[in-house]
Amino acid sequence: MRSWPAPEVPNLPEAGLPGPALPLHLHDTATGTVRPTRPGPTARMYVCGITPYDATHLGHAATYLAFDLVNRVWRDGGHKVCYVQNVTDVDDPLLERAEQTGQDWRELADREIALFRDDMTALRILPPDHYVGAVEAIPLIVEMIERLRSRGAVYEVNGDLYFPISADPDFGRVSGLTTEQMLPLFAERGGDPQRRGKKDPLDALLWRAQRPGEPSWESPFGPGRPGWHVECSAISIHHLGMAFDVEGGGSDLAFPHHEMSASHAQVATGRHPHAKAYVHTGMVGLDGQKMSKSLGNLVFVSRLRADGADPMAVRLALLAHHYRSDWEWTGEDLPRATARLERWRAAVQLPAGPPAAAVAAEVRRHLSQDLDAPSALVTVDRWAEQALAGAGERDPAAPAQVRAVVDALLGVAL
């Protein structure tokens, strides 16, 4: 599947701003601690993508922006990055929306994926190296289920195939939840704990046998379509192998999605862990509730753009909140970010400004500490204020260098 065009990223050492390669520290849900990432020459990251029936709301945008920062910090540190993102282009919510609106599910998915690409391009999100739809990955998914079956980790309930969580001794490590905590979340987030015939209420669907009126694909275990969690297991290990550096997504994916996909991969390969770190973004709310498709309380990037918002102001509005925080979008976020963007743009157009080396060092330091983007923005604010006031030492190279820092590390074009 085609992703979207990559924005050019300035090379800061070439711009005269070399700096120590600070190790990126991220909060790992599995351990509950902020730990250094220690990638090899090529950092490997998998981020769960959209189910394309309502793209792109600000909750989506905040998540992909957070992992865009991860990508940029690693690249600034001299790493190559192999970034994989999926698209769940066949799943119950998509099929239900298509039926409700009288659309062909493929046309709905194609339209929403195209809109998502446009939004990611406008927000200057670095594209994944592998952008993989569930439909195109069905051969990989079938192979994964066959591997699980060869290890005795598949059973049937009325033609549907399930994964027994008892097959993975590490089940529960990703989320750290108890069974009592898992059960209601499993029911709320696409699971079927009440289904009769399952060995454990938490066992996850691997393959849904063909139903009338639903799309299906041939497989060694009969026509049907894949479950949600095994999709990401198959795609991630095919492109990244096991023990890749970061698996990411919204905090509502920690359980069951990341928990289940890790167990599938670990049992299928006999290796642990699926990912070295599980990194999750907070929820963006509106009117006191999480912004979500099911609730319908969505603010869309495309609507903000259509109403005249500068995409860089939208990006700054999101960067002003720490990626792990739960926060509420209000009518003040965008005007505040627009004013900040205008100040920064005015400052970098000056013939000289305070030296940029300290700005680069501070922004790098803040981002290395669990992506503290809000503090990084304050660093640039201080420089812009001093530059506009004509205060302190003046360096004619500084405005262009600060523009490069803001572009390379924060992804904001000034």
From Swiss-Prot:
Residues involved in L-cysteinyl-5'-AMP binding: C48, G49, I50, T51, T63, N86, V87, T88, W228, G250, S251, D252, V284
Q: Which HAMAP family match?
A: MshC
Cofactor mode of binding and number, as noted:
Binds 1 zinc ion per subunit.
Record has ATP-binding as a keyword: yes
Question: Which GO cellular component term is one of those annotated?
Answer: cytosol
Query: Assembly and interactions?
Result: Monomer.
Q: Where is motif 'HIGH' region found?
A: 50-60
Q: Residue ranges for motif 'KMSKS' region?
A: 290-294
Name this protein carries in UniProt: L-cysteine:1D-myo-inositol 2-amino-2-deoxy-alpha-D-glucopyranoside ligase
**PANTHER family in the record:** CYSTEINE--TRNA LIGASE, CYTOPLASMIC, CYSTEINYL-TRNA SYNTHETASE
Query: Where do Low complexity bias regions lie?
Result: 11-38
Matching entries from InterPro entries are given as: Cys-tRNA/MSH_ligase, Mycothiol_ligase_MshC, Rossmann-like_a/b/a_fold, tRNA-synt_1_cat_dom
**Catalytic EC class:** ligase
A Pfam entry, by short name: tRNA-synt_1e
Q: What is its EC number?
A: 6.3.1.13
> What would you give as a GO molecular function for this chain, any one?
cysteine-tRNA ligase activity
What does the record give as the reaction this protein catalyses?
Answer: 1D-myo-inositol 2-amino-2-deoxy-alpha-D-glucopyranoside + L-cysteine + ATP = 1D-myo-inositol 2-(L-cysteinylamino)-2-deoxy-alpha-D-glucopyranoside + AMP + diphosphate + H(+)
UniProt keyword Nucleotide-binding, yes or no: yes
Keywords (alphabetical) are:
ATP-binding, Ligase, Metal-binding, Nucleotide-binding, Zinc
Motif span ('ERGGDP' region)?
Answer: 188-193
